[in-house]
Amino acid sequence: MLALKEANLQDAQKEYEFVRAIPENENGFTNPDFGVSFEEFVSVSLPRMIEWSEGRNLPDGFVPETYLFLWEENEIIGQFRIRHHLCPSLIEGGGHIGYFIRKDLRNRGYGKKGLALTLEKARKIIPENEIYLRVQKDNPASLHVMLASGGYIHHEDAHHLYVRIPK
């Protein structure tokens, strides 16, 4: 059974192993913890994730952001992030939600299922009437996930499609 769990210290080893496998930037999903040691992950990265989800110690211009891991039994399948509200840089940037599914598990429905679970949580947090997402034009699989989740293409630029999902 799939479940979302917020980043936490109890699952640090498995969270670290998952985060360590995420590239520094893939399809617009950035990994600020790329290349960190386990010790740094536990002492810096995880506390930051937890603090940011609570709106504490945010850098200037950042909004609260909840880090969620998608689990199937004892295995992490993906990471989803909910930014709690929009700021100017998020409106034409990453929007409310970003996600990453493990490469070896893509095209198996985990993106759709994980986004559905994330949307349930996001609808309780986000004050805007629509949930904003952005996808690179060369990532049709992720666009398909967003559209299958009730999204529509709101607009585009040279490199991205901007998707909205009604709340």
Please name every model-derived segment.
Residues 83, 108, 112-121, 125, ...:
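Extended, folded domain segments that form the structural surfaces/walls around functional sites
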Residues 98-101, 107-121, 143-148:
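Conserved acetyl-CoA-binding loop-helix of GNAT-fold acetyltransferases
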Residues 83-85, 96-107, 136:
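A short, internal acetyl-CoA/4′-phosphopantetheine-binding micro-motif in the GNAT/acyltransferase core
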Residues 12, 91, 108, 140-143:
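Loop/helix-junction capping segments adjacent to catalytic residues or to phosphate/diphosphate-binding pockets
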Residues 3, 98, 132-134:
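Short aromatic/hydrophobic contact patches that present stacked aromatics
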Residues 122-134:
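Conserved GNAT acetyl-CoA-binding A-motif
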Residues 1-96, 156-167:
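GNAT-family acyltransferases
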Residues 137-155:
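Conserved active-site alpha-helix within GNAT-family acetyltransferase domains
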